[in-house]
Amino acid sequence: MGTPHLQGFLLLFPLLLRLHGASAGSLHSPGLSECFQVNGADYRGHQNYTGPRGAGRPCLFWDQTQQHSYSSASDPQGRWGLGAHNFCRNPDGDVQPWCYVAETEEGIYWRYCDIPTCHMPGYLGCFVDSGAPPALSGPSGTSTKLTVQVCLRFCRMKGYQLAGVEAGYACFCGSESDLARGRPAPATDCDQICFGHPGQLCGGDGRLGIYEVSVGSCQGNWSAPQGVIYSPDFPDEYGPDRNCSWVLGQLGAVLELTFRLFELADSRDRLELRDVSSGNLLRAFDGAHPPPPGPLRLRTAALLLTFRSDARGHAQGFALTYRGLQDTVEGRASPEDSTESLAGDPDGANASCSPKPGAAQASIGARVFSTVTAFSVLLLLLLSLLRLLRRRSCLLAPGKGSLAMGPSRGPGRSWAVWYRRPRGVALPCPPGDSQAEGPAAGYRPLSASSQSSLRSLVSAL
């Protein structure tokens, strides 16, 4: 009877340790693009060929390109992401990431990188436009100053969901039904530079680069479980005297925000985060006080974001991802992120982002509690096992010799094990001991595996 319980205990032990290790939980970032700027200047991925999945030409290492304009030596602070690697980057603000390649017979020594994961959220892709019928069936127009945001703004004012740029100067508007019947084209087909911005691509010949008009909007109500909010006029720079607001509502007990890009001109350009129900200021960031680099969790059911720029403000702006979390171990906001504890901070400066004195102690306390709980369960299981085994007044397990039922003869020596509450004591049985001869007759010899398990258990006591 004791052996099956012992084997069950040994099988449960790794499982309990695994559960204890998982008690802290983990958070996974949303599966979004690796790029949040339209030209991929923020790409920090690991593609090192000009094509996806090893297609195209291999890139040269940035620390071996000193003969060219850009190398790791020209980026000592790592601002452009260059270093002792050969990953695609965009150090000069070109229309998309690129890399140096071994010079070809045509004298070409660099190539653009086709990176499927480097398309800013809100960009839906490159599509064929044959003109009959047009890929997007709404109104259209042309401009010699066309940028992505100029087209987005035009279609937003017309009340359409989608905006498409083509051939560097043409803009088309459409709806979701147009996209459903659209024909995707290779991403590299949309390679025409926008007439109004040298760092943006505006489709190609007979190719539409299609965007959601919500990109760079100045207001909106967001209820999707997760998504992205851009500063006004994005991917262009935000303009002066902007006063914009967005509402995130009913996404969960906790909201998690992560700033993927934050570049404001100065301290007079400011982003505020407020609880909708109370109006309390939760956080505030500006050009002099940027947000923390990691996820920011706020205990609020609905959040109001307000952005204001002064009369001179011009900068790239911001891009943030959000997602709603339930009030569980995985999504629980820390006390300093709660609405009540932040309501008294009118400035929203960086002091509100730093950990409070009790945060580390609370985290340690939680870990200690989970550890004590797990080992309490292990102790209860061990005590239950000992109670079952206590029915035997003596278990005989020989040493290196053969099993002897009774007094030891020869080099082997018998052992009598008395289990008492709450622990066991192992003592050698002297020759002729009644404990070794009497009760042993009522029990079968232990198997080799049981002897090994018992020996391990005794040594641990």
UniProtKB/Swiss-Prot annotation:
It is a single-pass type I membrane protein. Residues 387-461 are cytoplasmic. GO terms for biological process: limb development; negative regulation of ossification; Wnt signaling pathway. GO terms for cellular component: membrane. The keyword Transmembrane applies. Receptor for Dickkopf proteins. Cooperates with DKK1/2 to inhibit Wnt/beta-catenin signaling by promoting the endocytosis of Wnt receptors LRP5 and LRP6. Plays a role in limb development; attenuates Wnt signaling in the developing limb to allow normal limb patterning and can also negatively regulate bone formation. InterPro entries: CUB_dom (IPR000859), Kremen (IPR017076), Kremen_rcpt (IPR051836), Kringle (IPR000001), Kringle-like (IPR013806), Kringle_CS (IPR018056), Kringle_sf (IPR038178), Sperma_CUB_dom_sf (IPR035914). Residues 218-325 form the CUB domain. Residues 25-363 are extracellular. Disruption phenotype: Animals with a double knockout of KREM1 and KREM2 exhibit enhanced Wnt signaling accompanied by ectopic postaxial forelimb digits and expanded apical ectodermal ridges. They also exhibit increased bone volume and bone formation rates. Triple knockout mice KREM1/KREM2/DKK1 exhibit enhanced growth of ectopic digits. Keywords: Disulfide bond, Glycoprotein, Kringle, Membrane, Signal, Transmembrane, Transmembrane helix, Wnt signaling pathway. Disulfide bonds join C35-C118, C59-C99, C88-C113, C218-C244. This is Kremen protein 2. The keyword Electron transport does not apply. Residues 329-357, 429-452 are annotated as: Disordered. PANTHER family: KREMEN PROTEIN, KREMEN PROTEIN 2. Interacts with ERLEC1. Forms a ternary complex with DKK1 and LRP6. Residues 120-214 form the WSC domain.
